[in-house]
């Protein structure tokens, strides 16, 4: 994986996942607070990274974290965007659904555009979404931590990405620890 281009600057991390059929709020809310279920593991990883310190001195953050969610209704959005719940049956769960949302909302184009400034991009998405990301070449070489199917291990390695086999609902505790250590290493 590539080193940070600006070693003394804060480490910029982007975490990407997709929505869930579990809506935690009935009204308007941030996307971060709206989705539960399988998103919970990823939200815990985001919180862990966001609250970590570089050293014993807790005033020096380990990294600056941004969180993006690929939603069935709104496309790809930052997790702090305000959203309303939609029927759980409208949540993407098949290759056809993902392709339809891509046609309507171009989430791959938004991911490609917004991911360029980050030192590390952590991707925890379903297998078909990962295939779409790879096919579109939507993420930069040398900066991605891909939590995905073993089917993509070779392709991830060709792009100088860190491949982690998906464990658990989206991330898994062991993978979360590996990701945390990778971010700690690049932030030193």
Which residues are covered by each model-predicted region?
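Peripheral peptide segments
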Residues: 1-188
